[in-house]
Structures are given as structure tokens and as C-alpha cells.
């Protein structure tokens, strides 16, 4: 699931009964899902403090995987027992339109190849970053995404 506002709040009201396998909120959308301030989550994450983001994601009972995109700070993948943070080398941002969608596409592409969860997160960050470096809503090519260096740590 990759949505916001009212549809996201309706999903939250139906958890865990109607839990999807995967959601990909940004920090504001995670806040909407959990009833907390998403801007404060992103602010803390920007300072390298991920505990509140991880706790909020784990509070989404029934959802197996939560990818939280954090702009230039990268993204987190949170599961019941693990959490990872992946971040890109800096790029010149030309447009953020479609960057989250590209992140989700990169994650799912890696998943269909059978990659491990942490490598799916790396792919998500690479594709989202490549999209942000392109003008307008241009989708990156595989070679553009592959050119992005992504670091990863297990939290």
C-alpha cells in the first residue's frame, strides 16, 4: 500500500484485520497511520534517531514489512524482528515527484529477483534517489538506479 490522507486513515482503522503485507509511507504518512506527528519522526531520523520510527512501524499490527522513506536521509525497512537503514550518497535533487513510487518499484523489483530484505531496501533507496535526480516525473532506468551508491546498516 502506498497512499495518504483519508485512504490511509481508513486502513489504519481496519488494522490488523485488513493488514496488507507491505506499506511504504513517508514520515508524514506514518504519522497519519499511527496518530503521531510525522514531522517530528522525520526530524529525529534526520539526526540519526530512528527508535521512534521503528516503534511506530512495529505498532502497525499485522503488517509484515514497513518501508519508511525519509527523503535525503534514505529509508528504513522494519519487520517484526529486524530493522535496517539505507541511505544514498548525496545527489542534486531535481524533482521529488515519483521518487516514492520509484522506491517502491525498486523494492518490488528486487523482491521478485529473490533478494534478501536488506538488499530490497538498498534497491528501493537507489531507485528513489535516481528518480529524485531526474527532472519532473521522469522514471529512472535500471542503469541510473544501479549507479547510485547506497550504504546500509542493521539497527
What does each of the following model-derived ranges do?
Residues 1-3, 24-25, 67-69:
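General beta-strand structural signal in soluble alpha/beta enzymes
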Residues 1-2, 8-10:
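Loop-centered beta-sheet repeat module
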Residues 17-28:
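Non-cysteine beta-strand/loop elements that form the S-adenosyl-L-methionine
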Residues 9, 13, 17, 37-155:
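Conserved phosphate-binding/catalytic region of the ribokinase-like
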Residues 28-35:
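Active-site rim beta-loop-alpha module in soluble metabolic enzymes
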